[in-house]
């Protein structure tokens, strides 16, 4: 499942008429970097893209273009409109995951969940292979800088790679490992989404669910190598475009 229902107001006016995952970076839409890295993942049949009423038709058009360009793609796309029309009535990322799981009856499936504005260069084959058989696995990335980590979910892991501490946007970070928005959830974990939301927890940032979950179930980690870039502003968008254009050259 690709999360693409946000409104990216910090990137206005670029995202007034185009969803953030459809913005071009390094010669292709951000979401294509995600989808291309799914190639070869075993047993992947359907990629659900959850979006909003404003951009659903844009994602439909994009998915048709993608499949006509890349004939023989192993999976099909299903675009899900969450019905929201603005930042004021959005369901939030965790709300969207629960919405799709319920609507599409995915409660008995293992689910790979990825934020649609995640820019990373490594194939997800190894991540999925590592995650199979676990209740929950989250991708982590070493940002290499104690100042940079203050913008993200900072985690500590034990010798087995299980999360022992998770702090969102820490003032005093412990290490430089960031939890990033690439998740693998089993049916046992998907059933807890409703519990989490019913308790009035934050429905928006997907990392908040992991922060709640790790105290209840073991959450495994897998470190992503290569490049991972967070697109939160026009400046980081331009920087990402520059970096990925060079990588493709």
Describe each model-derived feature in a short phrase.
Residues 1-6, 202:
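Short, hydrophobic/glycine-enriched beta-strand segments
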Residues 2, 10, 24, 28-113:
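Conserved N-terminal catalytic core of the sugar/cofactor nucleotidyltransferase
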Residues 16-21:
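Short alpha-helical oligomerization interface
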Residues 22, 155-157, 221:
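A structural signal for short hydrophobic beta-strand segments in well-ordered beta-sheet cores
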Residues 35-36, 60, 121-133, 190:
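Short alpha-helix within the catalytic core of nucleotide-sugar-dependent glycosyltransferases
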Residues 116-119:
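The conserved acidic donor/metal-binding loop of glycosyltransferases
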Residues 122-150:
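Conserved donor-nucleotide/metal-binding helix-loop-beta segment in metal-dependent transferases, i.e.
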Residues 128-129, 162-230, 234-249:
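Catalytic-core segments of class I nucleotidyltransferases/pyrophosphorylases
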